[in-house]
Amino acid sequence: NDIMADADEMIRSYGFVLPPWAYWTPSEFKSRAEKAKAVIDARCGWDITDYGAGRYDEMGLFLFTLRNGRLDDLQRGGGMCYAEKLLISKQDQLSPMHTHVIKAEDIINRGGATMVIELYGSDPDGNFDETAGGVVMCDGIRRVHHAEPGLRRGWRKCGRRERDARRGDD
């Protein structure tokens, strides 16, 4: 509850307003189950995870899911094609690597803290390949990322000169 209260305070401090159902009690959800079916089915709401490691302060994440895209909608190009989640990490808190086969996702750093995202490509069969690069759109700019041994593969906030210098980009 402390993590949720702290997160709610932080979210509000940025002028973001959560939907009314964010504050419903379990009994309110039960009484409104039919009305809130889309919210419930999409597994929206509060989530605090330590990824099963039992070390939240080292490896954990707070999430509030506002919308959760459906794979079949994304594949057909209509309906709820994207997810919208508020993510809060503590200083130096890690999130384990994961992959999406198909995902429409924007990562927006609203708080302005330094954020490092490591990106890796796939082999021709779609499997993880730490030697493969890829393409990502960053603030509307197409960026090619290369997997280069010995270099940190990740960006610190798009547009940083240090990243560009490290990668040899203009």
PLM regions: where:
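Surface-exposed acidic, glycine/proline-enriched linker/cap segments
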Residues: 132-148
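Short, flexible loop/turn elements at secondary-structure junctions
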Residues: 68-70, 90-93, 111, 164
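A short beta-loop-beta micro-motif enriched in histidine and acidic residues
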Residues: 72-83, 94-106, 110-111
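Short beta-strand segments in beta-sandwich/barrel cores
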Residues: 85, 93-95, 114-117, 158
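Glycine- and acidic-residue-biased ligand/ion/polar-headgroup-sensing regions
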Residues: 90-91, 103-125, 130, 138-140
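A short, N-terminal "cap"/entry segment at the start of jelly-roll beta-barrel domains
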Residues: 1-82
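Conserved metal-binding segment of the jelly-roll/cupin
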Residues: 90, 146-170
